[in-house]
Regions:
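Glycine-enriched, solvent-exposed interface loops adjoining structured elements
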Residues: 1-239
């Protein structure tokens, strides 16, 4: 995987700008701007797509909480570096459908009042994850989330911003380079349309390659939908 310095040097080469010293020097205006634009590119990519490299699966015991709203604990502990939850991917053992959410105040009130009690909902409030039903520690909470930490430092710790030349992004280095190049041209008032098209094309190709393929249905043209299938695997004709 390419380091921060290697990506910046690649971007300088593409722009026909002389490379700076072999170390990252943030007192140099060009390198400082390149670093800022590289971070902007990485952070935008993190928010724009559900990258598999940033997807974190979690399996943890549910909390012992008999209240209608059960507190599962601090989100910062359950999901270090949380950017957002993966849609339709929060399950409680013993229930065949994913928990609905994050639900708004109206939805919470509806579920707590007994409306469609077969469904559980979840929401985040005051830094805690809540489920709209009692839970026990015998149950397991299973979900996945997207991490905001799109890079690693030299110690292997997740980070959401590059600061050192040895930091390593988890996203595609070429895509980050192309994103940095078109942003640099734009910021400096230079034509950037072709470089943006190059970036956008690379982004689409990588998104297509990174998207898991759907499950083939043996029951006709029905698409697989975990919310509508009784058994995870083959979509049912009545789904």
């Amino acid at each position: 995987m390419a380091t921060t310095l290697e990506i910046i040097q690649d971007a300088l080469d593409r722009l026909c700008i002389a490379r700076r010293p072999s170390t990252l020097d943030v007192t140099d205006d060009t390198q400082r701007q390149m670093l800022a634009l590289l971070n902007e590119t990485g952070q935008d990519l993190c928010l724009a797509f559900q990258w598999q490299a940033l997807t974190v699966p979690v399996v943890t015991p549910a909390a012992d909480d008999n209240n209608n709203l059960s507190d599962q604990g601090e989100v910062a502990t359950l999901c270090p570096g949380l950017s957002r939850f993966v849609d339709d991917c929060l399950y409680l053992n013993g229930r065949m459908m994913p928990l609905i959410g994050p639900v708004d105040v109206q939805g919470r009130t509806f579920l707590r009042a007994g409306g469609m009690s077969v469904l559980y909902g979840f929401f985040v409030e005051q830094g805690h994850l809540w489920i709209t039903s009692p839970t026990t520690s015998e149950q397991e909470l299973r979900f996945a989330y997207i991490s905001k930490n799109w890079a690693r430092d030299s110690q292997g710790s997740g980070i959401d911003r590059l600061t050192q030349e040895t930091d390593v992004p988890l996203l595609d280095a070429r895509l980050l380079t192309l994103g940095t190049v078109w942003r640099w041209l734009s910021r400096n008032g230079l034509p950037y349309q072709q470089e943006f098209l190059n970036y956008d094309n690379a982004l689409r190709v990588l998104q297509a390659a990174d998207t898991p393929r759907g499950i083939i249905s043996a029951s006709g043209p029905h698409t697989y939908n975990p919310r509508r299938s009784l058994l995870g695997g083959v979509a049912r004709p009545w789904a």
